[in-house]
């Protein structure tokens, strides 16, 4: 317990057990609950989350490759156009202006992204532009990727792709649940 989990998480598994409802000395106590069961559930939970996370990472990679492959078959797309349109939309959004811009700017200081950002004039008050799609896809979160995929699908009237947006949104929710217990 001390090395692999904490009491709060372990105790949360007890909610999977029924309680005695009849008045008496056991009322409100869990039926057949044993610490070993909680430990087993914790291990199973960990392994399932690990497996799901690996699958979700593969799905995210698939979506990036899918977008790039679709883009290659669109004559008017050069890898910059749709990203510029999307960043313009984000910058001027009435409800959540600069939401994506702010998310990207938070990453500017990150060692992982420095090579990408070194090429661009990064100013928090200026609109981002002229980032090629193959780099843009690497600096956005999975949720932002799905939002971009939806925009991309609508921009180029890719009806078959638009059908998948709902599924990818559910996968983002699953990813967040897996990552945050």
Where do the model's predicted regions map?
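Extended intrinsically disordered or low-complexity regions, especially N/C-terminal cytosolic tails and loops
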Residues: 1-172
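Active-site-proximal binding-pocket segments
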Residues: 174-181
